[in-house]
């Protein structure tokens, strides 16, 4: 497993505004999209491409284009939806699937309640969008779900990660090189309720309001 923390002043600036409890939902949504686009740039460094010959106004040359099958972007409902626009802005030709996983607040375990994904993901690079890597249960369940359907590589894009969550994922996937986590920051710890500290609160509630 590889972990990449995006070290960039714009990432740090946008994350600081997201953390601020005074930031309203419209601003939070906009900054989430912007931050995800920055993280997506890092997350797609190893995206699969192949050579392609083209003709410019001057001559012919060889460039690259995305290799088939197309990448799959998988937002985890509901908070991951707030990251989708930022990801597809950079990767507009990707297919989009949806996975509904939520954390049981008593056991902190992930529960699957929705699935809108192809049964066969053979050869696919999958990009999981989940803003908060807290306990790690949701991400582990997502990774296992995608690999069971044949995914070739899974990259998770998270706004924040907790050390406990990273350890949980690492324990589950080991040293396999086909799992990558890209995040804006690794925070201090989880509190007794399983929330990231200092964190930014409940990302879903801050994106969409309390439901």
Swiss-Prot record:
Record-listed E.C. numbers: 2.4.2.9
UniProt cross-references to HAMAP family, sorted A to Z: Upp_B
Catalytic activity: UMP + diphosphate = 5-phospho-alpha-D-ribose 1-diphosphate + uracil
Biological process annotations from GO: UMP salvage; uracil salvage
Annotated family: Belongs to the UPRTase family.
Chain's role: Catalyzes the conversion of uracil and 5-phospho-alpha-D-ribose 1-diphosphate (PRPP) to UMP and diphosphate.
The protein's name: Uracil phosphoribosyltransferase
Cofactors demanded by this protein: Mg(2+)
Group of enzyme by EC: transferase
Pfam families, per the entry: UPRTase
Pathway: Pyrimidine metabolism; UMP biosynthesis via salvage pathway; UMP from uracil: step 1/1
